[in-house]
């Protein structure tokens, strides 16, 4: 694929009492759109936000060779803050001042490693905005996440703690 620039919209959501989470990503490639989604149990909101970004970047890395420049749009201040905290976290070996591992250390390290393959422009968008042409994809990933969390929460049995990936191609 000759395309070297793409835009990705990500979101994550979690039912805090049940610890059931979902993540979604929309990858825009020229006139094509790829949707990635997944659900996870025993998780947190921040882990879902991170997972959405990681799964999207992993997809790009494995399925879209030649893509280097990524415009990554998220409403997560947590995700947006990670690039600028990288040096400090690495210098502290990903531990807190008390010597404990930082929250989500596994996913943070995975995100940093994946980020090395790309030039990523992390863009913060306000959550839950009214629909306009600029934010339709942010609304789409938000709705996908909330729907999956509701569906998982309504089921009495959640089958696996592993993330389940599904891909929809086209519009």
Where are these regions (language model features)?
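RNase H catalytic domain
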Residues: 13-19, 54-137
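RNase H-like nuclease fold core
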Residues: 1-47, 51, 58-61, 83, ...
């Amino acid at each position: 694929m000759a395309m070297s620039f793409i835009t990705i919209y990500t979101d994550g959501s979690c039912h805090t009492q049940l610890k059931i989470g979902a993540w979604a990503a929309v990858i825009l490639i020229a006139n094509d759109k790829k949707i990635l989604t997944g659900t996870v149990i025993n998780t947190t909101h921040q882990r879902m936000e991170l997972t959405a970004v990681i799964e999207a970047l992993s997809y790009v890395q494995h399925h879209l060779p030649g893509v280097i420049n990524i415009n990554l749009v998220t409403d997560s201040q947590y995700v947006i803050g990670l690039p600028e905290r990288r040096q400090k976290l690495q210098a502290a070996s990903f531990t807190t001042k008390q010597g404990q591992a930082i929250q989500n250390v596994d996913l943070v390290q995975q995100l940093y490693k994946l980020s090395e393959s790309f030039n990523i422009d992390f863009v913060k968008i306000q959550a839950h905005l009214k629909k306009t042409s600029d934010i339709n994809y942010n609304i789409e990933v938000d709705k996908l996440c909330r729907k999956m969390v509701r569906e998982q929460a309504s089921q009495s049995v959640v089958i696996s703690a592993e993330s389940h990936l599904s891909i929809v191609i086209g519009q």
